[in-house]
């Protein structure tokens, strides 16, 4: 099993590629979170009926996180997201500097939920 398939999720999720304008299913995207046709990031529309949280995400590897991304910490998809101020190599991990939080460390191939919009 790919580490990317172990990402935190919300109960209702729909997947699409903005470039190919194609709906995708979980089996097509869960191991890379990229479109199988064009390799662009898959957009994830996610909904939590219990909290009525509706968000749009992309899922990146830890080593793909960039300054300016908005990320959700593990288990916090229904809570605040944090602005990425920068990244650095910290031994075998990626250190992600987050505004209002401090540094959060992930493995290079660890999945990170990046918010790109509301629901």
Model-derived segments and their meaning:
Residues 18, 77, 110:
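A broadly conserved detector of short glycine/acidic/proline-rich loop/turn motifs that flank catalytic sites
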Residues 1-12, 92-93, 100, 105, ...:
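A broadly conserved sequence feature marking short terminus-proximal activation segments
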């Amino acid at each position: 099993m790919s580490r990317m398939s172990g990402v935190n999720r919300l109960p209702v999720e729909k997947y699409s590629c903005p470039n190919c304008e194609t709906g995708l299913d979980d089996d097509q995207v869960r191991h890379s979170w990229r479109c199988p046709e064009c390799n662009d990031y898959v957009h994830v529309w996610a909904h939590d009926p219990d909290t009525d949280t509706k968000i749009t995400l992309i899922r990146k590897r830890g080593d793909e996180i960039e300054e300016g991304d908005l990320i959700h910490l593990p288990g916090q998809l229904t809570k605040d997201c944090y602005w990425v101020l920068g990244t650095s190599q910290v031994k075998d991990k990626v250190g992600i500097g987050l505004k209002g939080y401090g540094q959060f460390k992930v493995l290079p191939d660890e999945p990170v939920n990046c918010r790109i919009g509301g629901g």
